[in-house]
Amino acid sequence: MRYLFLLNPAAGKQDCTVQLIPQIRAAAARAGWSAADYTIHTTEYAGHARELARAAAQEAAQAGDSLRIWTAGGDGTFMEAMTGVQGFANAAVGCLPYGSGNDFLRTYGTRAEFTDLDAQLAGGEVTIDLLETSLGLSATICAAGLDAQVAYGIPKFRRIPLCGGEMSYLLSIVEQLCGRIGRRVTFTIDDEELTVDCLMCAICNGRAYGGGFLAAPEADPADGWLDVMIVRRVGRLTIAKLLGMYKSGLHFVNGQLTEEAKPYFLYRRARRVALRPADGRGPIVATADGECAPCDAVEAVLRPLSGRILLPAPAYERFVAKRSSVDAK
């Protein structure tokens, strides 16, 4: 078994490498690893984690070894490594959450579990579904609409002096709320086609995105289905109430939309989803696991059980127990 840590110093509010490198070495020693058992790399540019992960997986495969990779950064760094190891059955990827969103872990456990290096090294490998999207591979959620527009606008405000992460986020929200809200969008959900006046939508393999919005609070990332949540366009006075419900996951309980949510939400289960603007206003902004861009059309296709991930020990035990329960039904 080979072990690799990929640390992204540009993720989050501060460089995680200074504190993490000695902590990794100490945890490795407690696990009985020698210095030759693992490697620590610091990424230097966008896409570097993908390159390093792929090279390591290929080298391990040629030697007949298995490989475990942990990324330290955000969801984008994690998905870079996941993309890099695609096609290598010998490799699995885990996440140390030191980015700004860290939504991947919310489907499986808590931040405390995922930052516990001893639990990470003692954890196990599981197989999950992945999403192939217009923005690349995703383990969690592909979304479009108001929330994606807010995310897309943040970098512009970060360039303003003394405008940090939270202020940039608030300014981007204000900008979007001052503009025209919502889009008319045509969805193709498996064999169903519908056109909706849409505030935003989420195609979900995992449960959360956008820094903790529980779009699909009961999503199972290994059940072979996507949970599709479409939020209808509403007036500005209703948005705050709607977003509060959406963030807390109170719109969806026991496998269905709540009565309070039904006027505002549409829910479907599918394996393939496509959407395109139907209002003649140009591209729609979409986001998926750290990537964000305007798109003329967005497509998300389920890739069943195509991702091999690492979970810290408590999360791994819960995942295995749940899968055993589901399989027994």
Positions of PLM-derived features:
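Gly/Ser/Thr-rich active-site loops/lids in small-molecule metabolic enzymes
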Residues: 158-168, 211-212, 217-240
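Glycine-rich phosphate/pyrophosphate-binding beta-alpha loops
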Residues: 143, 147, 202-217, 291-292
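Short N-terminal binding/cap micro-motifs at the start of the first secondary-structure element
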Residues: 12-16, 210, 309
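ATP/nucleoside-binding phosphotransfer catalytic cores, i.e., glycine-rich phosphate-binding loops
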Residues: 189, 220, 230-329
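Catalytic core of DAGKc-family lipid kinases
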Residues: 43, 87-203
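Short Gly/Thr/Asp-enriched flexible loops that form oxyanion-binding sites at enzyme active sites
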Residues: 77-90
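Glycine-rich beta-strand-to-loop/alpha-helix junction loops that act as flexible
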Residues: 9, 72-74, 96-98
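ATP/NTP phosphate-donor binding region
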Residues: 1-69, 316, 323-329
